[in-house]
Amino acid sequence: MSYTVVALGGNALLRGGEGSIQDQRDTIEQTVPHFVDLYERGHELVFTHGNGPQVGQLLLQNEEAESAAEKPLDVLGAESQAQIGYLLQQQLREELGETPATVITQTIVDEDDPAFDDPTKRIGPFYDEDEASEKDFPVKEGTDGDGNVGYRRVVPSPKPVDIVEAEHIKTLVETGKPVISSGGGGVPVVEDGDSLTGVAAVIDKDRAAQSLATDIGADEFLVLTDVDAVYRNFGTEDEEELSELTTEEAADMLAAGEFGEGSMAPKVEACIEFVESGGDRAIITKPETATEALDGAAGTTVVPADE
């Protein structure tokens, strides 16, 4: 029995379109068949996923629904986990012939994490300067996909400390059922005595997926994104595909600024942490080459430094 945590990138849930439920269904229908071979080979699968566009839509609905009570960000995060989990459950059941389970996941963070003093994670819709000046939350200037300048809400992005439901997730995996969990990095919560309190923050989904993978004792950590592998000098004439990296080599490349801070860097960091915490290997690739990557024929595999 091999436990494999599969971290789905945003492109595995939504590609183009307007972000409607049907758009998400269409994308998920294209993504899920790539995992049939893994399941049939005996991999016990735990899926994690992002939730950026979905939470963005919920935040916009929050603002436009003037007659309804506003919902806090932690509740919207939980709602998005249920929404995406439902869509994945339906397609996984159809493709795998097995009924999966979605676990609404909470991720403990440290209330003294420095990220709370420096919110940097942009979420939600864009505002013009006048709209931004009226908001009661911090905003930062940025550009949208078309290069237009605007302002977006920013929230802290603290590091995950512990996955509250990890034990329950492992129990489900041991039954042979696919599990969907830690959506959007999980709902960030802080400990308050014996209680947990949700906070307005967003946890990096890859770091949270790694934390879960380590907590449940996963053998493999499969990080899926929109490129087929990790590259040296990515996007240049000298780019070089890397089929294998030791944790030491990957850490050196991170320190040299080889990877984009908002894209590949957190994925590589998560892979290093997983392997250094006892995992067998971590792999970065795209959904279409997931099986080949586990066979060593595609993607980038991160292995212990002494191998």
From Swiss-Prot:
It is found in: Cytoplasm. Keywords: Arginine metabolism, ATP-binding, Cytoplasm, Kinase, Nucleotide-binding, Plasmid, Transferase. It comes from the Archaea. GO terms for biological process: arginine deiminase pathway. Induction: 20-fold induction in fermentatively grown cells. This is Carbamate kinase. Pathway: Metabolic intermediate metabolism; carbamoyl phosphate degradation; CO(2) and NH(3) from carbamoyl phosphate: step 1/1. GO terms for cellular component: cytosol. Its EC number is 2.7.2.2. It catalyses: hydrogencarbonate + NH4(+) + ATP = carbamoyl phosphate + ADP + H2O + H(+). GO terms for molecular function: ATP binding; carbamate kinase activity. The keyword Cytoplasm applies.
